[in-house]
Structure formats: structure tokens, C-alpha cells
């Protein structure tokens, strides 16, 4: 029996959402129980022996991964959502998109000051959303001690952007090109 890598479970869709784009679809990874288990185990591997108070996941696929990682760590999960999706009091950070601006939010009481947080998402492209998530967590007085992704798109510079902020970045696989 051959063992598949996480990369083998990820489907590439040509010209989605726009012509010239190679979309890396992780839903095929999520749908396969073996692939999903491998991904969660590998997301956790670099952090063996470390203690986290919370896992934060970026909307939307980061919720799937972050929830599973938090379960494995027996810790709480904090969703970082698009503006207007969370009830109650929130704090927000805006960040630049290719054509405009976006805002992400978190509940202002989701994480207690001084907690250590692992940030999780499916894909690292430019790093804008992850950077905004890190800034939200830091506004609450907490420390992001790692950023874990399934896919890194190195040509888009997200890893360099987060490492320039002093973040430790872990990705299970990389896909060159757009």
C-alpha cells in the first residue's frame, strides 16, 4: 500500500475563480478521513510538547482545521470572522485586498490577556488575512506562538510577510505558481 502525502489529497482547479488561477481545493482533503487525520497530525507535529491556551482559526476553512486542532490539544477554539458575523462586542482589524479592503473581527473576551495562541488556516497566500488575525490576537494582549497552514503559495510572499513579523510559520505543502 502506498502512503499519500497531504499534497496528494488536494485538488487543483484550473481557471478558478478567474482565468489564469490554479485554485488549490482542500475540500477533497477534508472529505477523506485518512487525509484529514494526516493533515491534523502534521499541523500539530512541530508544536509537540508546547502548551497553547487557544487555537484561532481564520474564516472559513480555518474553522474546520482549527476546531480539529483545538480538539486534539484539549483547548478552546476562537473563530476570527469577517466583519458583522459575530454577535456581541468585538474588536476588528482592516487589511488590504488586491482590490479594496476587508475587515476581520473577534469577540473582545475570546482570549484572556497573556494566553498563548496557535493560528490555523488552510492556505497562506499573501498573508494579509493571517497578519490581520495576528494583530487582533495581539490587541487582546496575547501571543501568537505559531502559524500553521495546510498549503503555502510561496510565490505570493505570505510566509516572508509573517516571518518579518517574527512569526514561526509551518505549512504542510507548497504549490509554486498562481
Swiss-Prot record:
TM helices/strands, residue ranges: none
Catalytic activity: AMP + diphosphate = 5-phospho-alpha-D-ribose 1-diphosphate + adenine
Annotated CDD domains: PRTases_typeI (cd06223)
Disulfide links within the chain: none
Entry's Gene Ontology molecular function annotations: adenine binding; adenine phosphoribosyltransferase activity; AMP binding
Assembly behavior: Homodimer.
PANTHER family documented for this protein: ADENINE PHOSPHORIBOSYLTRANSFERASE (PTHR32315:SF3)
Function as written in the Swiss-Prot or TrEMBL entry: Catalyzes a salvage reaction resulting in the formation of AMP, that is energically less costly than de novo synthesis.
Name of the protein: Adenine phosphoribosyltransferase
Gene designation: apt
